[in-house]
């Protein structure tokens, strides 16, 4: 077993290129291939300069090679990944899906990564999901420990219009559906809603998110606030630019909140600037979270194979 898992990146756009720079720093992942469909792609050109094997002939080319990757990161679009996913599985290649296709279980690193380290295909949900579902999870965790529930959570993700390429715009419907589902199934809210705003401001604004969670009126607010701070610190281990804008705000039940107590959390995400500009935190958190998931999968796989310590 090699000391690193051999990795292919499928897709050659902005997200794939930023992901490549992050994977190059990994102790457990070795990016060897980048696959696209545009021979003039800047992503493929950059990958070639960095020594990767590249092709503009898509997944067909990759799967025709004698030497195949252990792990694929796919950053194309939902419909493309839905078609490719069964082919990866048939070839014995594990996949980390950065599209909203949701073929495999959805993963938010602070919430449920350990549960899915052996899954053949995992989904990174959406940029808004990676930024906001950890907060919903933090609130639900604290409330559940007190014997309560979170009946409703709503997230609003505001991202720079400049950071939203054609893939993001084409996937808006999938974004809202996939993120809303994740707010419930991973965040733990009984009902969830997701809204994305493309901010046209110039100069571009960094990603900012608002998370509303309904909570029991008698919930321990200090415990909820501490749970939120703990999860933010965990996200910061792989997204250093992830931060609270201020302390969580608690409001008593009112007509405006449907008669429920509410905690509101404001976060912003500044990108690391590996390839994408720092204001594109919405894209950076996707690539950083995907790299985190890939590293943990690799640690587990290499440890089980005796190739490295977990």
Curated annotation (Swiss-Prot):
TM ranges: none
Catalytic activity annotation: acetaldehyde + NAD(+) + CoA = acetyl-CoA + NADH + H(+)
Domain of life, per lineage: Bacteria
InterPro entries: Acetaldehyde_dehydrogenase (IPR003361), Acetylaldehyde_DH_C (IPR015426), NAD(P)-bd_dom_sf (IPR036291), Semialdehyde_DH_NAD-bd (IPR000534)
Keyword NAD found: yes
Classification lineage: Bacteria, Bacillati, Actinomycetota, Actinomycetes, Mycobacteriales
EC code(s) of this entry: 1.2.1.10
One matching Pfam family: AcetDehyd-dimer
Broad class of enzyme this protein falls into: oxidoreductase
Key words, A-Z: Aromatic hydrocarbons catabolism, NAD, Oxidoreductase
Phosphoprotein in keyword set: no
Molecular functions (GO terms): acetaldehyde dehydrogenase (acetylating) activity; NAD binding
Active-site residues, as the UniProt record annotates them: 127 (acyl-thioester intermediate)
Similarity-based family: Belongs to the acetaldehyde dehydrogenase family.
Any one of the GO BP annotations: catabolic process
Residues binding NAD(+), per UniProt: 12-15, 163-171, 282
Protein name: Acetaldehyde dehydrogenase 2
